[in-house]
């Protein structure tokens, strides 16, 4: 199960990156049950609205993700995110599908 965060391009990308990589990601790393985090920067928009970053946070299953969302660590990370990314963030839960 994945928690996916999509970020619109911030007004000040350098300040966003500093807050995100120096503070936010270390806070997220403390969330119980989080197995892996992958951050991708978008380099080209082919169709639709452009985005800045995508972060995929991997959890072993939905129950673990649900539990993680209720932890003090996730609350702290969420409060931190709101301090610099208000209005820029879309959060999604995604389940990996088997290959066809």
List each language-model region with its residue ranges.
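Macromolecular interaction modules
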Residues: 1-100
């Amino acid at each position: 199960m994945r928690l996916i965060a999509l970020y619109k391009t911030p007004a000040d990308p350098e300040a966003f990156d500093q807050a995100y990589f120096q503070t936010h990601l270390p806070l997220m790393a403390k969330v119980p049950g989080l197995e892996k985090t992958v951050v991708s920067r978008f380099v080209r928009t082919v169709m639709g609205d452009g985005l800045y970053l995508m972060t995929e946070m991997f959890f072993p299953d939905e129950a673990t993700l649900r539990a993680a969302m209720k932890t003090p660590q996730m609350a702290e990370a969420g409060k931190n995110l709101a301090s610099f990314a208000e209005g820029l963030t879309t959060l999604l839960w995604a389940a990996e599908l088997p290959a066809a």
